[in-house]
Amino acid sequence: MVENGGDIYLDCKRDLRVEVHAGQSSLSGKIILMIRSDRMPLGVCTSSGTVGHSFSYGRADAVCVLSVSAALADAAATRIGNLVKSAKDIERGLKTAEEILPGIRGVVIICGSHMGLAGDVELAG
């Protein structure tokens, strides 16, 4: 496992859980991704317009993208995050993610108290 500021590369022999940090969103820390060992290696990359120092055109609290390519996951999270300026834009972000499929496996978008999912995303119970 390698982590660098919201970007994670996973390659483990056991299942892992990844918590999505979404800043001040009421959903922050409540969304846990289940990453099965048979789905790795996997890049899990998060972009935010409200958390951290990186510039974003959007205001999503978290856009988390899963892909076999960590570089693609990072780029897709940034692209989708730039589109989400309010909760009303979550659907637009999901449609953009679906255009990138199957290059990415899935996406989680959190904006305020709203969330959207697309693709192969398993939430831990």
Model-flagged regions — what are they?
Residues 1-89:
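Conserved mixed alpha/beta catalytic, RNA-binding, or beta-rich assembly cores of soluble enzyme
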Residues 2, 66-113, 117, 121, ...:
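Alpha/propeptide regions of enzymes that mature by internal proteolysis
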